[in-house]
Amino acid sequence: MILQAAEPVLVLASQSATRRTLLERAGLRFEALPAAVDEAALKESAEAEGIPPEDAAIMLAEAKAERLARRLPDALVIGCDQLLVCPMEDRSLRWFDKPADLAAARIQLLALRGRTHRLVTATVAWRGGARIWQDVSVPRLTMRSFSEDFLDAYLAAEGEALCASVGGYRLEAMGVHLFSRVEGEHSAILGLPMTPLLRF
């Protein structure tokens, strides 16, 4: 059975182990290459300018894909980005980053506890110097009101791996215990919505 055409070469503009695993499990042949983009600066600028999270996620995904597509004009380059946004008590919309360490992950998870947040997950495809496709998936996840003792046990069990996730949790592992409700495609929560990508 042919799942993928021989051409064009598929390139993932990401070093994310989770995204690579999603593509591998779908039986796709691809190369994963880093895109030298200052994500933090782009994200900070977008937030400061009041750009909606959906537009900011597309902008970040596109920056990654475009950077590699200019070097690899015949390839089909997939760029991805994911933003976590959550309304807070003061009605502001807070944008979260990957925690720097477990102490930061603890603070972040306490801020998300008992709230519903959105994972704005953008995917773009570039080929021949132009964007030819884009998708934005927005799963909604509600954390239960867990105790601090539970949180400390979770952090000890998962360790530094949590710092690789914008949420400070891994839904595909023990992080599932943190939630009372999850809405949206599982692969979108993990950072690469496979259903729309494979339809494209």
Regions inferred by a protein language model and the residue ranges of each:
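Anionic-ligand binding patches
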Residues: 2-10, 47-200
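Short, charged, surface-exposed secondary-structure boundary motifs
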Residues: 41-47
